[in-house]
Amino acid sequence: CPPLC
């Protein structure tokens, strides 16, 4: 899951 998960 860009940019963070």
UniProtKB/Swiss-Prot annotation:
Keywords assigned: Disulfide bond, Lipoprotein, Methylation, Myristate
Lipidation (N-(12-oxomyristoyl)cysteine): 1
Post-translational modification: Occurs in 2 forms which differ in the post-translational modification of Cys-1. In form Eudistomide A cysteine is modified to N-(12-oxomyristoyl)cysteine while in form Eudistomide B cysteine is modified to N-[(12R)-12-hydroxymyristoyl]cysteine.
Sites of N-[(12R)-12-hydroxymyristoyl]cysteine lipidation: 1
Keyword Lipoprotein assigned: yes
Cystine connections: 1-5
Cysteine methyl ester: residues bearing it: 5
Protein name as annotated: Eudistomide
